[in-house]
Amino acid sequence: MTKKEKKSFNQSLAEWKRFIYNPTSGEFLGRTAKSWGLILLFYLVFYGFLAALFTFTMWVMLQTLNDEVPKYRDQIPSPGLMVFPKPLSALEYTFSASDPSSYRGYIEDLRKFLKPYTLEEQKNLTVCPDGILSEQKGPVYVACQFPIFLLQACSGMSDPDFGYSQGSPCVLVKMNRIIGLKPEGTPRIECIPKDENVASISTYPNNGIIDLKYFPYYGKKLHVGYLQPLVAAQVIFSANSTKKEVTVECKIDGSPNLKNQDDRDKFLGRVAFKIIARA
């Protein structure tokens, strides 16, 4: 058996040049111009067809969607609750009344959140009658004013520090928006401390009432300028208690069609947070 002769560098280079372009057959990278043209035409037609099919499919799907109201919505009829300011970790507010830097972030978050609720921002909103649903047929949907003074000590008007500098912090609670929701009865948000010997809770508006005039909600695109009703919970620690740590639970109450308890979702209609006031 004879060993295969090793090709010289010049021979290998010549073969590569011939592969890239063969002047005898006119081939480029092993294919003639006609062959390359047919391949490019095939892929152009093939991917053009796929793009057209995708575009047509998307167009058909978009025809089934409403531009103003989502076609598919959460099947849970009751809203959850959210709190502000945003806690730094695990729904826990830790601060020291004697150290402004410890609660500065909370105050800034509250001011930013309440900016749309100022009188100047609400001047184009409607003064709606209290106690009745604001059902509307369109095409123009009005948004009701939410007087910020209803939050009283937690409005930021009389106390720009929202009680944190006094050791009595405010936390705002709101319901999540659900399009078309019509609460029955007299909905309110009730906030209670786990240990009543440590602290008491003052809620604003009085009794945590949520006025029916803010319902139903018609969606972000239709209901321009809509403001969600708020309830403020102010934690007031007992002067006789040396412990300045309490867990507060807020839940929706007073409305038969709004749930605050569900076996599959323990947070439905309720929220719990902890307040820790350090010396």
Swiss-Prot record:
One of its GO terms (biological process) is potassium ion import across plasma membrane. Gene3D superfamilies: Na, k-atpase alpha subunit. One of its GO terms (molecular function) is ATPase activator activity. Its main location: membrane. InterPro entries: Na/K_ATPase_sub_beta (IPR000402), Na/K_ATPase_sub_beta_sf (IPR038702). It is a single-pass type II membrane protein. Residues 1-35 are cytoplasmic. It is found in: Apical cell membrane; Basolateral cell membrane; Melanosome. GO terms for cellular component: apical plasma membrane; basolateral plasma membrane; melanosome; sodium:potassium-exchanging ATPase complex. The sodium/potassium-transporting ATPase is composed of a catalytic alpha subunit, an auxiliary non-catalytic beta subunit and an additional regulatory subunit. Interacts with catalytic alpha subunit ATP12A. Belongs to the X(+)/potassium ATPases subunit beta family. This is Sodium/potassium-transporting ATPase subunit beta-3. The lineage of its organism: Eukaryota, Metazoa, Chordata, Craniata, Vertebrata. The gene is ATP1B3.
